[in-house]
Amino acid sequence: MAFKDWMNNLRDYFVEDDEEFNEPARPVQESRPTVASTPKPKVEERKAQPEYQTRRPAQSTSKAQTQTAAPKRAGSTFTKPMPEKIVQQQTVSQSQSVAATVSTIAIKEPRAYADIMESARIVKNGECVLVNFKFMGDAQARRSIDFMTGVVFTLDGDIQNVGGQIFLMTPANITVDAAKEMSILAGQNFESYDIY
């Protein structure tokens, strides 16, 4: 009886508090074929398996322990790959979310001041807009640039003169390398559309 009490105490030490353990341990120790027919004792023995392996050199191994240790090893290997599968699923979902966040640039050529509202809505939705004022008069273009500057300022974005009558409006999460832009624009006369 002392050995049985010692085994129960050892099992209780390794069984977590949230797991319920049924007490059909007496039939399990009396006849091994009943253990094979009932699935719950197998699950409990798998969880208790590491203590048998760690204590085995100190104890004398019996035939019953060696027979039950082999199925436990097979059961314990099935639980180890599961976290790896979860990690793989997370990386797939992360790559899918990265592919879903591809930025687009809308190109607009407004003909009147009222057409600028569509460009402002696009920037508000987090996309870039390239606006070409070639079909708009000088006074309306200046007024539109003032409006777009206010919209981009409110959204904490940026507006840049890309060339001639073309302006790029970007939301807050997108930056443009201004050094390359300034080297392209160097020496060209864009004073009539300068927003700075």
Swiss-Prot record:
InterPro entries: Cell_div_SepF, Cell_div_SepF/SepF-rel, SepF-like_sf. Keywords: Cell cycle, Cell division, Cytoplasm, Septation. It holds the Pfam family SepF. Residues 16-81 are annotated as: Disordered. GO terms for cellular component: cytoplasm. Coiled coil: none annotated. One of its GO terms (biological process) is FtsZ-dependent cytokinesis. Gene3D superfamilies: SepF-like protein (3.30.110.150). It is found in: Cytoplasm. Residues 56-69 have a biased composition (Polar residues). This is Cell division protein SepF. It comes from Lactococcus lactis subsp. lactis (strain IL1403). The lineage of its organism: Bacteria, Bacillati, Bacillota, Bacilli, Lactobacillales.
